Amino acid sequence: MSHNDTIVAQATPPGRGGVGILRISGLKAREVAEAVLGKLPKPRYADYLPFNDADGTALDQGIALWFPGPNSFTGEDVLELQGHGGPVILDLLLKRILTLPGLRIAKPGEFSERAFLNDKLDLAQAEAIADLIDASSEQAARSALNSLQGAFSTRVNHLVEALTHLRIYVEAAIDFPDEEIDFLSDGKIEAQLNTVMADLDAVRAEARQGSLLREGMKVVIAGRPNAGKSSLLNALAGREAAIVTDIAGTTRDVLREHIHIDGMPLHIIDTAGLRDASDEVERIGIERAWQEIEQADRVLFMVDGTTTSAVDPADIWPDFIARLPAKLPITVVRNKADMTGETLGLSDVNGHSLIRLSARTGEGVEDLRNHLKQSMGFETNMEGGFLARRRHLQALEAAANHLDQGKAQLLGAWAGELLAEELRLAQQSLSEITGEFTSDDLLGRIFSSFCIGK
């Protein structure tokens, strides 16, 4: 497949609807307009026309929009046909267009890919299109739109420009060592480097917020049978998502709920009670529970407050704690406070968070919601914020590491050449976000996750 091909795809969701849109982009778009419409519409005006078959009979009628390149979404000639949204009608029209030479069905995300390749969008903006479509909350949608409008890219580009200026200064000091002013030791480079590092830290903090909005937080509820795990899932979900009985081992498989806390997506996972099980089905459920625990962002360790007064997880169940991944955050949830009379609320026990609540009555559950939000550093007021993906966080972290290494070289040995190289690598890491330095393989993976007509 070539980027010189003319591509066509349905731009509206499959199925029946009031309107169905076909989008065509490429050199042959003009020929499609003349063949199907009988004329070339006036650029950027809505023209109501019949959509004709090869023999001149009308297949449909609707709005035609003509956007000659480079003033179009893709930067190429683009034709949009907006007809009726019946799948049969759209299929007939699509088949008609594909009878013309030089046209093919677009790959997923190929329209956005062409916009990127033709400098209509950078890579972060192109990704924001998919994120806007997939947004699961109002806040996520607003942040995705900010990214599409360039909020994230602008911040990254400012960092790249600052690094470029700093590299020029450092390399001038290297190339002209006999000058009276020692650029490397006069403090100016260190001051500029500190400014860039502080700006990068601010962008990283906002990117983590944006990643939380997009990816969400995976929270696994784990503990012994009958500790109240399913009751807590229901309390957090606000509905009867799980069956709750007094019979130990009622939950035998993984249950998932997706909720939002002040805009932050939360993936809650209820698991089978952990114990030595002789029943094969329950044993499989317990193994699945451990698989989810190992992939969690946080574990809610449910404890039946009527069975123990211990609050330290190592005292409550040392074998469970020993099996957990080393850096996995734990919140001990002492349940059934309505029966024990314990004081509700959050406290700290040996570096672990402890919360007392009643999953049955809902008392203390709001404290848990706030704790989950705060534990991830999530801020509800993100006006002007942007969405970020995991690869963006990795690129920002790589850039920060290179700047740390560069500063160490500057302060330790006044090694200008090594500092300049670390600045170059940091600049390259940041440029991967916007696509200035990005492999073709990565581009393929990114755009293949898009909708067909985007």
Curated annotation (Swiss-Prot):
GO biological process: tRNA methylation; tRNA wobble uridine modification
Enzyme class: hydrolase
Cofactor binding summary note: Binds 1 potassium ion per subunit.
Keywords for the protein's UniProt record, in alphabetical order: Cytoplasm, GTP-binding, Hydrolase, Magnesium, Metal-binding, Nucleotide-binding, Potassium, tRNA processing
Binding positions for GTP per the UniProt entry: 226-231, 245-251, 270-273, 335-338, 358-360
S-S bonds: none
Protein name: tRNA modification GTPase MnmE
